[in-house]
Amino acid sequence: QIDADGQHDADDVPRFLAEAQAHPDAVINGRPLYDESVPMGRLIGRYATHVWVWINTLSLDIADSMCGFRVYPLAATIALLDRERVGLRMDFDVEVIVRLHWSGLEIRNLPTRVTYPLDGVSHFQLWRDNVRISMMHARLFFGMLWRSPRLLARRLLPAVRG
Protein backbone atom coordinates (compact mmCIF):
# COMPACT_ATOMS: atom_id res chain seq x y z
CA GLN A 1 0.00 0.00 0.00
CA ILE A 2 1.24 3.46 -0.86
CA ASP A 3 -1.09 6.40 -0.49
CA ALA A 4 -1.72 8.31 -3.70
CA ASP A 5 -1.31 11.71 -2.06
CA GLY A 6 2.24 12.25 -3.30
CA GLN A 7 3.71 12.40 0.22
CA HIS A 8 5.66 9.14 0.11
CA ASP A 9 8.91 8.45 -1.71
CA ALA A 10 8.03 5.87 -4.38
CA ASP A 11 11.76 5.19 -4.85
CA ASP A 12 11.51 3.20 -1.59
CA VAL A 13 9.10 0.64 -3.11
CA PRO A 14 11.88 -1.84 -4.08
CA ARG A 15 13.35 -1.65 -0.55
CA PHE A 16 9.93 -2.30 1.02
CA LEU A 17 9.26 -5.22 -1.33
CA ALA A 18 12.68 -6.74 -0.63
CA GLU A 19 12.00 -6.52 3.11
CA ALA A 20 8.59 -8.15 2.57
CA GLN A 21 10.19 -10.99 0.61
CA ALA A 22 12.77 -11.50 3.36
CA HIS A 23 10.04 -11.41 6.06
CA PRO A 24 6.83 -12.65 4.38
CA ASP A 25 4.86 -12.99 7.62
CA ALA A 26 5.65 -9.47 8.86
CA VAL A 27 3.98 -6.12 8.29
CA ILE A 28 6.49 -3.83 6.61
CA ASN A 29 5.57 -0.44 8.00
CA GLY A 30 6.82 2.97 6.93
CA ARG A 31 8.45 5.13 9.61
CA PRO A 32 8.27 8.67 8.22
CA LEU A 33 11.29 10.92 8.04
CA TYR A 34 9.71 14.35 7.70
CA ASP A 35 11.14 17.46 6.12
CA GLU A 36 10.22 21.05 7.01
CA SER A 37 6.97 20.85 4.98
CA VAL A 38 5.12 18.80 7.62
CA PRO A 39 2.33 20.83 9.28
CA MET A 40 2.78 21.02 13.06
CA GLY A 41 -0.90 20.17 13.65
CA ARG A 42 -0.48 16.90 11.79
CA LEU A 43 2.60 15.96 13.81
CA ILE A 44 0.76 16.58 17.07
CA GLY A 45 -2.33 14.63 15.94
CA ARG A 46 -0.23 11.74 14.72
CA TYR A 47 1.69 11.61 17.99
CA ALA A 48 -1.56 11.44 19.97
CA THR A 49 -2.62 8.45 17.87
CA HIS A 50 0.78 6.81 18.31
CA VAL A 51 0.48 7.08 22.10
CA TRP A 52 -2.93 5.38 21.97
CA VAL A 53 -1.51 2.66 19.72
CA TRP A 54 1.36 2.06 22.14
CA ILE A 55 -1.19 1.75 24.96
CA ASN A 56 -3.50 -0.47 22.90
CA THR A 57 -0.68 -2.84 21.93
CA LEU A 58 1.16 -2.62 25.27
CA SER A 59 4.32 -2.13 23.21
CA LEU A 60 6.36 0.32 21.17
CA ASP A 61 6.62 -2.13 18.25
CA ILE A 62 4.66 0.13 15.88
CA ALA A 63 6.85 3.18 15.25
CA ASP A 64 4.22 4.99 13.16
CA SER A 65 0.63 3.82 13.06
CA MET A 66 -0.63 6.22 10.41
CA CYS A 67 1.94 5.91 7.64
CA GLY A 68 0.28 5.15 4.32
CA PHE A 69 3.30 3.21 3.03
CA ARG A 70 3.19 -0.48 4.00
CA VAL A 71 3.38 -4.02 2.77
CA TYR A 72 0.84 -6.31 4.43
CA PRO A 73 1.19 -10.10 4.55
CA LEU A 74 -1.77 -10.98 2.35
CA ALA A 75 -3.10 -14.17 3.98
CA ALA A 76 -3.05 -12.74 7.52
CA THR A 77 -4.60 -9.46 6.38
CA ILE A 78 -7.40 -11.16 4.43
CA ALA A 79 -8.12 -13.42 7.41
CA LEU A 80 -8.30 -10.35 9.66
CA LEU A 81 -10.64 -8.50 7.28
CA ASP A 82 -12.84 -11.60 6.97
CA ARG A 83 -13.36 -11.83 10.74
CA GLU A 84 -13.28 -8.17 11.87
CA ARG A 85 -15.08 -5.03 10.81
CA VAL A 86 -12.44 -2.31 10.51
CA GLY A 87 -12.68 1.34 9.58
CA LEU A 88 -12.68 2.32 5.93
CA ARG A 89 -11.25 5.84 6.09
CA MET A 90 -8.46 7.42 8.12
CA ASP A 91 -9.00 4.82 10.83
CA PHE A 92 -8.18 1.86 8.54
CA ASP A 93 -4.37 1.96 8.69
CA VAL A 94 -4.27 2.32 12.46
CA GLU A 95 -6.85 -0.36 13.21
CA VAL A 96 -5.40 -2.93 10.81
CA ILE A 97 -1.85 -2.63 12.10
CA VAL A 98 -2.99 -2.83 15.74
CA ARG A 99 -5.12 -5.91 15.06
CA LEU A 100 -2.33 -7.60 13.07
CA HIS A 101 0.03 -6.88 15.97
CA TRP A 102 -2.51 -8.39 18.38
CA SER A 103 -2.57 -11.53 16.23
CA GLY A 104 1.18 -11.90 16.73
CA LEU A 105 2.60 -10.57 13.48
CA GLU A 106 5.99 -8.92 13.57
CA ILE A 107 6.04 -5.23 12.64
CA ARG A 108 9.17 -4.14 10.76
CA ASN A 109 9.54 -0.36 10.62
CA LEU A 110 11.46 1.03 7.66
CA PRO A 111 12.40 4.71 7.41
CA THR A 112 10.96 6.55 4.43
CA ARG A 113 10.97 10.21 3.45
CA VAL A 114 7.65 12.02 3.66
CA THR A 115 6.93 15.47 2.26
CA TYR A 116 3.77 17.53 2.18
CA PRO A 117 3.42 19.10 -1.29
CA LEU A 118 2.25 22.73 -1.22
CA ASP A 119 -0.54 21.91 -3.66
CA GLY A 120 -1.37 18.59 -1.98
CA VAL A 121 -4.97 17.55 -1.44
CA SER A 122 -6.07 16.10 1.89
CA HIS A 123 -9.13 13.88 2.14
CA PHE A 124 -9.15 14.24 5.93
CA GLN A 125 -12.56 15.44 7.14
CA LEU A 126 -11.69 17.20 10.39
CA TRP A 127 -14.73 16.46 12.54
CA ARG A 128 -15.97 13.25 10.94
CA ASP A 129 -12.57 11.56 10.80
CA ASN A 130 -11.57 12.69 14.29
CA VAL A 131 -14.80 11.19 15.67
CA ARG A 132 -14.12 7.94 13.77
CA ILE A 133 -10.54 7.80 15.02
CA SER A 134 -11.63 8.51 18.62
CA MET A 135 -14.26 5.76 18.47
CA MET A 136 -11.69 3.38 16.99
CA HIS A 137 -9.23 4.12 19.82
CA ALA A 138 -11.98 3.45 22.38
CA ARG A 139 -12.82 0.09 20.73
CA LEU A 140 -9.14 -0.83 20.54
CA PHE A 141 -8.59 0.14 24.17
CA PHE A 142 -11.33 -2.22 25.34
CA GLY A 143 -9.99 -4.86 22.95
CA MET A 144 -6.57 -4.43 24.56
CA LEU A 145 -8.05 -4.91 28.03
CA TRP A 146 -9.58 -8.22 26.91
CA ARG A 147 -6.29 -9.30 25.30
CA SER A 148 -3.95 -7.84 27.95
CA PRO A 149 -3.01 -11.17 29.60
CA ARG A 150 -1.84 -12.55 26.25
CA LEU A 151 -0.18 -9.27 25.23
CA LEU A 152 1.67 -9.08 28.54
CA ALA A 153 2.70 -12.74 28.28
CA ARG A 154 4.10 -12.02 24.83
CA ARG A 155 6.19 -9.18 26.30
CA LEU A 156 7.44 -11.32 29.18
CA LEU A 157 7.82 -14.57 27.22
CA PRO A 158 8.85 -13.61 23.67
CA ALA A 159 8.24 -17.17 22.42
CA VAL A 160 4.48 -16.57 22.92
CA ARG A 161 3.20 -15.27 19.56
CA GLY A 162 -0.39 -14.97 18.40
Question: Model-derived features: where do they sit?
Answer:
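Hydrophobic helical membrane-anchoring modules
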Residues: 83-162
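Active-site loop/turn elements of alpha/beta-hydrolase fold enzymes
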Residues: 6, 32, 112
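Short beta-strand and adjacent tight-turn residues that come in two discontinuous sequence segments
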Residues: 1, 30, 110
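Generic secondary-structure signature for well-ordered alpha-helical cores
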Residues: 1, 18-21, 139, 143
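Short beta-strand-to-loop acidic/aromatic patch adjacent to the donor-nucleotide binding site
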Residues: 1-7
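Acceptor/aglycone-binding surface of glycosyltransferases and processive sugar-polymer synthases
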Residues: 10-90, 117-124, 128-134
